[in-house]
């Protein structure tokens, strides 16, 4: 088993401002981002409330998440609870790990997707255009099919080049009892990765079986990175695995 976040003391996140010359200065204290913190495993920056200023979202493992709203004067305030992204739809903090933001529904604002531990669904928060969010994980088809998995790396990418952003999730268990292991399974933490196809109507379907043999393989995946590795015009995926080789998709 891997040690959970309760074994460690959380420390405040840090914010570094780019000086514009390739160097950075620590502005954590003056920015006000030390007032609330948790065991953070994911971070993403975007203009969530559409005011022209970049905000910062932090995903915490087992504690409420933070949405640092840019106050336009160098300071940030945590607006996660008011915005509806501190907790899930049931009012519970989840084991947030993998995280990405994108305009998956093409309505002009960035939405949030994050992965969680086995028995917790992955979560999709849909932005209303003013920085308020609605947890629609179950309604869009991303809930029940994720319950058996522990997700780490994730990303929005258009896998099939149909103009709609799909989801790739790198999975791997952290506890043997969460791995739903079979009798005498020599690799109890291994899980298969997942691919969700965006249907273009606000809903998703799991398309892992159509994604090829890489989504049939079971490993202890912990991270994913995305880019056009071979310069052929489409997005490739690199997944890292504990006690195993990285995979290039």
Predicted regions and their residues:
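Acidic, glycine/proline-rich Ca2+-coordinating loop motifs
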Residues: 1-249
């Amino acid at each position: 088993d891997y040690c959970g976040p309760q074994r460690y003391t959380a420390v405040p996140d840090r914010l570094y401002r780019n000086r514009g010359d390739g160097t950075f200065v620590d502005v954590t204290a003056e920015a006000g981002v030390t007032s609330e913190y948790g065991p953070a495993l994911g971070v993403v920056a975007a203009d969530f409330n559409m005011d022209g200023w970049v905000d910062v979202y932090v995903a915490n493992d087992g504690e409420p998440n933070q949405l640092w709203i840019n106050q336009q004067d160098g300071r940030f305030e945590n607006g996660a609870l008011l915005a509806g992204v501190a907790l899930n739809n049931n009012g519970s903090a989840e084991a947030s790990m993998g995280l990405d933001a994108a305009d998956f529904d093409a309505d002009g604002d960035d939405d949030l997707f994050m992965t969680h531990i086995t028995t917790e669904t992955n979560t999709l928060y849909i932005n209303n255009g003013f920085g308020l969010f609605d947890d629609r994980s179950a309604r869009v088809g991303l809930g029940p099919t994720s319950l058996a998995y522990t997700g780490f790396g994730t990303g929005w990418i258009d896998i099939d080049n149909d103009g709609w952003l799909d989801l790739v999730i790198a999975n791997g268990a952290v506890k043997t009892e969460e791995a739903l292991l079979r009798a005498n399974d020599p690799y109890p933490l291994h899980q298969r990765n997942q691919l969700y196809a965006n249907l273009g109507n606000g809903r998703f379907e799991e398309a892992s079986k159509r994604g090829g043999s890489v989504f049939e393989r079971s490993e202890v995946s912990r991270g994913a990175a995305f880019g056009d590795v071979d310069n052929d015009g489409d997005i490739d995926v690199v997944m890292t695995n504990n006690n195993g080789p990285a995979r290039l998709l």
